[in-house]
Amino acid sequence: MSKAKVTNARRKRSVRLKLRRSGGGRPRLSVFRSSKHIYAQVIDDLKGETLASASSLEKSMRDGGKTGADIDAAKAVGKLLAERAAEKGVKEVVFDRGSYLYHGRVKALADAARESGLSF
């Protein structure tokens, strides 16, 4: 493993552990972004299960023929995830950005989730 990958993995693990300690039992909204798509899921760490998930790979997102790697796709994923979480009765989460900066697609997803009813 290269030094950059090791450092990135350590940072990601550190962020996740801090959130689990300070989460107070709230579910965790975890974000993963690749060069072509963005994924998000609401995870209950106490039970070890995923409560809701959404990604730019879903058929409803791909109908526009646009890429899943832009800010508009991130906003749509955030909105969809918040709706699915609300169906499961989840209103409060802890935001887990992993090793990604709170900027661009990650920020757009978080803002859209907040506007759609999730609080964090």
Curated annotation (Swiss-Prot):
Cited Gene3D superfamilies: 3.30.420.100
Pfam families in alphabetical order: Ribosomal_L18p
Keyword Ribonucleoprotein: yes
GO molecular function, a single term: structural constituent of ribosome
Family, similarity comment: Belongs to the universal ribosomal protein uL18 family.
Quaternary structure and partners: Part of the 50S ribosomal subunit; part of the 5S rRNA/L5/L18/L25 subcomplex. Contacts the 5S and 23S rRNAs.
Function: This is one of the proteins that bind and probably mediate the attachment of the 5S RNA into the large ribosomal subunit, where it forms part of the central protuberance.
Protein name: Large ribosomal subunit protein uL18
Source organism per UniProt: Bradyrhizobium diazoefficiens (strain JCM 10833 / BCRC 13528 / IAM 13628 / NBRC 14792 / USDA 110)
Taxon lineage: Bacteria, Pseudomonadati, Pseudomonadota, Alphaproteobacteria, Hyphomicrobiales
Gene: rplR
